[in-house]
A protein has these predicted regions:
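Residue-level signal for the membrane-embedded core of alpha-helical transmembrane segments
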Residues: 31-34, 38-41, 145-148, 152-155, ...
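Hydrophobic alpha-helical transmembrane segments and adjacent short intramembrane/lumenal linkers
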Residues: 168-182
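Residue-level signature of catalytic and energy-coupling elements of molecular machines
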Residues: 25, 43, 75-76, 91, ...
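Membrane-interface helix-boundary signature
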Residues: 18-31, 132-138
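Short, strongly hydrophobic alpha-helical membrane anchors
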Residues: 1-24
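Hydrophobic alpha-helical transmembrane segments of polytopic membrane proteins
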Residues: 179-198
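Transmembrane alpha-helix/interfacial motif
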Residues: 24-70, 74-76
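Predominantly long cytosolic amphipathic alpha-helical stalk/bundle segments
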Residues: 3, 57-171, 198-234
Length: 234
């Protein structure tokens, strides 16, 4: 930062973070803008995933309850459906095997269950992948924002020493601006990184529980399918 510009800010008695950003060194300014964008991006991802993961788990649970209560026919279960209910998609993935289970011969029993298992596994992976799409940005922001802020800090401190050398003066008017820039970059880096790391860990746990729930329902479907193929209608 130009020391004269910083002095003008102080003399006007209207110092603020916005004015600090506008008067900052171009490199530090680029760092601060990048961190602001990263922070906004991370909160956008957090908001979207908060509703997406919660909604997906709720809908899958609703279908599972309907299935065990004998109301699965309330859902459209044809393969290739556009439903956003993961539970319904799991059942749709084995709907053909479910229909054929009543008439399958004993020699085809194992093959039918194996086909269903592969289809369910692929569907679970696809559904978890769809819901988790985007949370990698939180990991990137959480791991990189601190270092980006640190770069701005180093640059601001370097400018402070350069100003001391150029002005041959160690007064606050000379070093205050660059030091303020350095501290602001550090703080903004932490502001961007900390929420990103916290919510990345939270969503990772939520996704693991979501995947476990779908896996458990898949295994229940396989058991019911196997019994249906062996014993006829349940």
């Amino acid at each position: 930062m130009n020391p004269e510009a910083m002095a003008d800010v102080h003399t006007q008695g209207a110092f603020s973070m916005v004015e600090l950003l506008l008067a900052a060194d171009p490199v530090v300014k680029a760092v601060l803008i990048a961190l602001v964008i990263a922070s906004i991006w991370s909160w956008a991802v957090v908001t979207e995933k908060f509703f997406a993961i919660g909604g997906a788990r709720k809908k899958a649970k609703e279908f599972e309850e309907a299935f065990w209560n004998g109301r699965a026919d309330e859902y459209e279960l044809r393969p290739g459906q556009s439903s956003n209910n993961a539970g319904a998609k799991l059942f749709a993935a084995i709907s053909r095997e479910w229909r054929d289970a009543k008439s399958v011969s004993p020699s085809e029993h194992a093959a039918l269950v194996a086909r269903a298992e592969r289809s369910l596994r692929a569907t679970v992976d696809r559904e978890v992948g769809n819901v988790s799409n985007g949370i990698g940005a939180l990991a990137t922001i959480g791991s990189s924002s601190v270092y980006i802020g640190l770069f701005g800090t180093v640059w601001g401190i370097m400018n402070a020493f350069l100003n001391i050398s150029a002005q041959e003066d160690t007064s606050l008017a000379v070093v205050g601006g660059p030091i303020a820039e350095a501290l602001f970059a550090t703080g903004l880096g932490l502001i961007a990184a900390i929420p990103a790391v916290i919510f990345y860990n939270k969503f990772s746990g939520d996704l693991n529980r979501y995947a476990d729930m779908l896996d458990a329902f898949s295994q229940d479907l396989l058991v019911r399918l196997s019994r249906r193929a062996s014993d006829g209608p349940i």
